[in-house]
Structures are given as C-alpha cells and as structure tokens.
C-alpha cells in the first residue's frame, strides 16, 4: 500500500481552502494540519502561563517549548497541546482576541513552520495556507493553488456569514476587503502568497465544493499511482 502523501493547498483569502482540505483529508483518512489552530494553541499556552501576548521574547520561548499534535476526530479534528486535548479551548474568545499578536512574532512563525514540517514528515497529511507549497513543504508531491475571482470569494463569505447569522458588511465592501488582503498577502516580505512552480492551479470560481474535492482527489490518486 502506498504511504500517505503530503498535500499542500495554497491560495488567497476565502478561496475555500480549509473547507476543501478538511474534506480531502477525511476522504483519504489523512490528518488535516490546521495551521491556524497551531497559532491558537501557542496563544492558549501563553495565556495559561500568564504571559503578556505582546511580550515577543517570552511568547517565542513558549512557542519553542510546546508540542502540538493533531488526531482525526469523528466530527472535527482533535488538537493536543503537550498531550492534553485543547480542541475547544483554542476557540475561546480570549484566544481569538490575542492570536493575531502572537502570530505576528517572527520567531513564532519560524517555530510553527518547523513543527508543521515535523507533523508532515510521515506523509498522510493535508495542509492549507498561503505558503505551504513554497515555504513549509516545498517537496510535497501534491501542490494545489486554489483561486477564485474576488467577487465570487466575497459572495461565498457573504452567504456563509448570513447563514451563520453574523452581521456583515455589504458584498461590495467584502470584495474590497478581499482585494486589499490579496494585495497585502502577495506583496509581504516574508513568505508572500505565490504559486509554487510545480503547483496545479485550480480556478474554483464556477465549481461546487464537491467538484473541487473530486478534482483534488483525482490528482492525489494519480500521484499515488505514479509513486507506487
């Protein structure tokens, strides 16, 4: 049997990467490495130890000391911090309020990249983000670059917010925000959003989630056959 592959899914904000990555991981019984959850776990550890999230030096020390693991769960993926399950704790409002400050520390990003590589070492993993195929897992045999028009991404986010009962700005405002985020992501100095030369570009503007999952699944199966 072919060993599980490393699957890297990159793309701009609101392209549906996480939704698709989770479904693909479930389909192949792979681990989904939620990179955002890792930064939340660091934030939780920082708060639990009574450290100021704005104290870059101490925050970086915590990031280097902790160990984060993922395990597939029935309903959602389980997250562990130093062996203790924190799946729900990392979603607490106090964590959400401080995660941006923690994630902005360069030493934290460096450490998380290192841990993400360790998690992916044995394969059988799906990871999504902005720089997975270019920076975190440049050797991944499957690299997908998911794109969709700014209007379509804004429309999806707008519909999602309405379904969740979240008060949101107009569709036009959402589109402007997404276009601004695209510009920031693609022009930042550290790990900018760019398509890896060997990544397969997938324009999902006119595709359903099921169609995207099906397309990526075909790519994974084809790669498995080639490497078998």
Swiss-Prot record:
One of its GO terms (cellular component) is cytosol. Keywords: ATP-binding, Cytoplasm, Kinase, Nucleotide-binding, Transferase. Its EC number is 2.7.4.25. It catalyses: CMP + ATP = CDP + ADP; dCMP + ATP = dCDP + ADP. The keyword Cytoplasm applies. The keyword Repeat does not apply. One of its GO terms (molecular function) is dCMP kinase activity. InterPro entries: Cytidylate_kin, Cytidylate_kinase_dom, P-loop_NTPase. Pfam families: Cytidylate_kin (PF02224). It comes from the Bacteria. ATP binds at residues 11-19. It is an enzyme of class 2 (transferase). One of its GO terms (biological process) is pyrimidine nucleotide metabolic process. NCBIfam families: cmk. Belongs to the cytidylate kinase family. Type 1 subfamily. This is Cytidylate kinase. It comes from Limosilactobacillus reuteri (strain DSM 20016). The lineage of its organism: Bacteria, Bacillati, Bacillota, Bacilli, Lactobacillales.
